[in-house]
């Protein structure tokens, strides 16, 4: 059996989608993003072949904090357990390292123990756990309360509030966008401030952005942290500002006291995930 990893091509779509379309009960997002991923200059897709037949794939995305994000790993059910996912991961690390990247991250569902074992084999370690919450059924956006949009001149204040928040520590200092995690470095926060994506209420800080995939459009609270009362008020002021969003997600690190406040407001957990990381210096 000959196994090989190579860059993805347009012709790989049909054989890969033949099994990917059945993943997650037919709700896998890969079919809706394949064409865009293939064209994306900020990322690279790879395919693993067995005897010349594409049976798996993954993608590397380069993020604004200088890290590489690994996503979209899929292997045909008939070929699992043969080291193909590890081949894809190791190839992605070599590819990213050759471009000077020293930090690699990925995520997996909190209950996907098989994936966690595979991830540990390529020497990634768990750094944080997150849950994603949604407003209650029948939610009607009614933004209210005090929220101040922070600007480029507020960098030092915002960095101080971020670093002092329990959520920053619990969440390994990252924010989420398009379901990828990047470090809230000064450079990244400077960009978010320039976008108008950073908000404050009291000592709480939130990052809010829009996301879209295929025909879907959603609102993301990419980061929320600070005292519970301030954070709750900030969420009341921010969630629902994007009137075009069909879904709204709030990313919160597990063990954050904000979670209890969300539940009291009727928010429900959509899913939970584990953040994994590997650094070049770690081997």
Predicted regions and their residues:
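Conserved GNAT acetyl-CoA-binding A-motif
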Residues: 96-110, 118, 243-253
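Conserved active-site alpha-helix within GNAT-family acetyltransferase domains
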Residues: 86, 110-128, 254-270
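Conserved catalytic-core motifs of GNAT/GCN5-like acyltransferases
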Residues: 62, 107, 125-139, 268-279
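A conserved beta-turn-beta hairpin within the catalytic core of GNAT-like acetyltransferases
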Residues: 62-70, 80, 210-221, 269-272
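Conserved beta-strand in the GNAT
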Residues: 47, 53-61, 69, 74, ...
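Conserved acetyl-CoA-binding loop-helix of GNAT-fold acetyltransferases
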Residues: 75, 81-94, 117, 121, ...
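Amide-forming acyltransferase catalytic core, primarily the GNAT-like/NAT-type
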Residues: 123-215
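Active-site rim helix/loop that mediates acceptor-substrate recognition in acyltransferases
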Residues: 13, 20-59, 167-198
């Amino acid at each position: 059996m000959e196994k090989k990893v190579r860059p993805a091509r347009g012709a790989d779509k049909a054989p890969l989608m033949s099994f990917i379309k059945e993943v997650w009960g037919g709700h896998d997002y890969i079919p809706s993003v394949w064409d865009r991923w293939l064209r994306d200059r900020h990322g690279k897709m790879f395919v693993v072949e067995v005897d010349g037949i594409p049976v798996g794939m993954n993608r590397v995305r380069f993020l604004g904090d200088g890290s590489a994000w690994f996503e979209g790993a899929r292997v045909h059910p008939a070929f699992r357990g043969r080291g193909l996912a590890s081949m894809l991961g190791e190839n992605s690390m070599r590819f990213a390292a050759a471009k000077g990247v020293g930090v690699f991250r990925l995520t997996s569902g909190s209950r996907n123990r098989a994936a966690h074992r595979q991830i540990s084999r390529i020497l990634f370690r768990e750094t944080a756990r997150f849950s994603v919450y949604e407003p209650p059924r029948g939610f009607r956006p009614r933004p209210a309360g005090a929220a101040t949009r922070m600007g480029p001149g507020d960098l030092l204040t915002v960095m101080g509030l971020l670093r002092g928040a329990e959520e920053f520590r619990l969440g390994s200092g990252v924010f989420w966008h398009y379901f990828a995690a990047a470090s809230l470095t000064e450079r990244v926060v400077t960009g978010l401030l320039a976008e108008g994506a950073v908000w404050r209420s009291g000592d709480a800080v939130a990052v809010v952005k829009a996301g879209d995939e295929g025909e879907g459009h959603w609102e993301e609270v990419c980061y929320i942290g600070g005292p519970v009362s301030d954070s709750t008020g900030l969420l009341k002021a921010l969630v629902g500002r994007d009137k075009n969003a069909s879904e709204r997600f709030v990313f919160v690190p597990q063990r954050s006291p904000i979670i209890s406040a969300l539940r009291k407001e009727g928010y429900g957990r959509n899913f939970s995930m584990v953040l994994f990381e590997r650094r070049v210096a770690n081997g």
